[in-house]
């Protein structure tokens, strides 16, 4: 049996908004497994949280760069937000994005790529020595189309093409570039706001979909619903779920009448003058998935002074 700590209960409460005692029971019932505890609370109807909220746990910048039919996102982490406002660091992020646009998303290739008389890896090391903080190229993504364009958007940019959140969206089309670019900008902003998990249902992780179905089914079983009815309810529930997490099925944030993104794209074909296919998107939020180390200052002082 796992030990349930106050920190675990606090994390679950912050994630789900459920009371402390219910969170403690959920963790106890599931041997300290955070995801299982979240699902347990959802089955009890106590939480609507689908997963632990992605808390920004690292500083730095997301860099976005496009060149007609190709676009790239990079994440470069630093230790403090202060460094993210440093012009040298901002220049480093832009340089890395330019390199990634040429060599692709493989981090080893980016780090080994030549920059002047040295390499990207050396440029990062030099910046660390000059600025005095550890920095790392965490990830990169590239989208490309044969015909059309890749659009980008950086939310709350601290400098041109770099900020805390970046998006690229790929549009395949032979239509008017200016109209396509306008649509691409709107789609990029939509992705930044709505945070879809996949382009369409087929692109979702099967394990995630299976877990979603299990949570819904168990919830209605506990309510005493007959199995035949549960199957239909879950089927309808999945349709709603897809509208929440799949880009093409989401309600387009720029349409007041509630059209889906797919419908908005289809409608835009008239303005563009050719068919449009959204072939992919990438959304990077700074620090997502990185656990941030925290410290108890009072405990550190007590430890340093030999107190318990």
Swiss-Prot record:
Keyword Ion transport: no
Location, primary (coarse class): cytoplasm
Region described as Involved in Mg(2+) ion dislocation from EF-Tu: spans on this chain: 80-83
InterPro entries: EF-Ts_dimer_sf (IPR036402), Transl_elong_EFTs/EF1B (IPR001816), Transl_elong_EFTs/EF1B_dimer (IPR014039), Transl_elong_Ts_CS (IPR018101), UBA-like_sf (IPR009060)
A GO cellular component entry from the record: cytoplasm
UniProt GO molecular function: translation elongation factor activity
Gene3D superfamilies linked to this entry: 1.10.286.20, DNA helicase RuvA subunit, C-terminal domain, Elongation factor Ts, dimerisation domain
Keyword Acyltransferase: no
Keywords: Cytoplasm, Elongation factor, Protein biosynthesis
Localization terms from the record: Cytoplasm
Pfam families: EF_TS
Function: Associates with the EF-Tu.GDP complex and induces the exchange of GDP to GTP. It remains bound to the aminoacyl-tRNA.EF-Tu.GTP complex up to the GTP hydrolysis stage on the ribosome.
Family to which the UniProt record says this protein belongs: Belongs to the EF-Ts family.
Record-given protein name: Elongation factor Ts
Species this protein is from: Rhodopseudomonas palustris (strain BisB18)
């Amino acid at each position: 049996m796992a030990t349930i700590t106050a920190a675990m209960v606090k994390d679950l409460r912050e994630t789900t908004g459920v009371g402390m005692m219910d969170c403690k029971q959920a963790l106890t019932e599931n041997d300290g497994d955070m995801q299982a505890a979240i699902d347990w609370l959802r089955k009890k109807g106590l939480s609507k949280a689908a997963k632990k909220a992605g808390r920004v746990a690292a500083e730095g910048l997301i860099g976005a760069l496009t060149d007609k039919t190709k676009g790239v996102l990079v994440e470069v982490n630093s230790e403090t937000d202060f460094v993210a406002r440093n012009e040298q660091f901002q220049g480093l992020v832009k340089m890395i994005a330019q390199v990634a646009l040429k060599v692709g998303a493989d981090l080893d290739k980016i780090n080994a790529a030549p920059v002047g008389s040295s390499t990207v890896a050396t440029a990062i090391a030099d910046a660390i020595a000059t600025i005095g903080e550890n920095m790392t190229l965490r990830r990169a993504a590239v989208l490309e189309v044969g015909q059309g364009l890749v659009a980008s958007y950086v939310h709350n940019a601290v400098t041109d093409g770099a900020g805390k959140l970046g998006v690229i969206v790929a549009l395949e089309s032979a239509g008017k570039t200016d109209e396509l670019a306008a649509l691409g900008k709107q789609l990029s902003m939509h992705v930044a706001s709505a945070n879809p998990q996949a382009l369409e249902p087929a692109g979702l992780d099967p394990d995630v979909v299976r877990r979603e179905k299990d949570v819904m089914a168990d919830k209605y079983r506990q309510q005493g619903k007959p199995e035949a009815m549960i199957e239909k309810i879950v089927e309808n529930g999945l349709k709603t779920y897809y509208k929440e997490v799949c880009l093409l099925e989401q309600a387009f944030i720029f349409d007041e009448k509630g059209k889906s993104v797919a419908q908005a794209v289809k409608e835009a074909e008239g303005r563009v003058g050719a068919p449009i296919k959204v072939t992919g998107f990438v959304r990077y939020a700074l620090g997502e998935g990185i656990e941030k180390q925290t410290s108890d200052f009072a405990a550190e002082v007590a430890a340093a002074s030999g107190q318990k």
